[in-house]
From Swiss-Prot:
PROSITE patterns: HISTONE_H4. This is Histone H4. Gene3D superfamilies: Histone, subunit A (1.10.20.10). Residues 17-21 bind DNA. SMART domains: H4 (SM00417). Core component of nucleosome. Nucleosomes wrap and compact DNA into chromatin, limiting DNA accessibility to the cellular machineries which require DNA as a template. Histones thereby play a central role in transcription regulation, DNA repair, DNA replication and chromosomal stability. DNA accessibility is regulated via a complex set of post-translational modifications of histones, also called histone code, and nucleosome remodeling. Residues 1-20 are annotated as: Disordered. The nucleosome is a histone octamer containing two molecules each of H2A, H2B, H3 and H4 assembled in one H3-H4 heterotetramer and two H2A-H2B heterodimers. The octamer wraps approximately 147 bp of DNA. It comes from Chlamydomonas reinhardtii. Keywords: Chromosome, DNA-binding, Nucleosome core, Nucleus.
Length: 103
């Protein structure tokens, strides 16, 4: 294994990397009805029109923080796959303990 690290099964010199489409503005995929449903589940009766953009902003920030911590745990364990336990530990670190996903 010529310096390929853990699990280097590849033949040849490496080949081209696949390109992934750059994802922009996907936060708009959290639709107005989806936010309404979440609010209803939380017991909200009426919703101001300004709530939707603010909710998207807060959700994006929250997910960025959780994902950043999860990826940190993954990299520390020298893995390439984020596991459910990485997310559980990331949430616990932020003071939001989640039960039911192992550990």
């Amino acid at each position: 294994m010529s310096g390929r690290g853990k699990g280097g099964k590849g033949l040849g010199k490496g080949g081209a990397k696949r390109h992934r489409k750059v994802l922009r503005d996907n936060i708009q995929g959290i639709t107005k009805p989806a936010i309404r449903r979440l609010a209803r589940r939380g017991g909200v009766k009426r919703i101001s029109g300004l709530i939707y953009e603010e909710t998207r902003t807060v959700l994006k920030t929250f997910l960025e923080n959780v994902i950043r911590d999860s990826v940190t745990y993954t990299e520390h364990a020298r893995r390439k796959t984020v596991t459910a336990m990485d997310v559980v530990y990331a949430l616990k670190r932020q003071g939001r303990t989640l039960y039911g996903f192992g550990g």
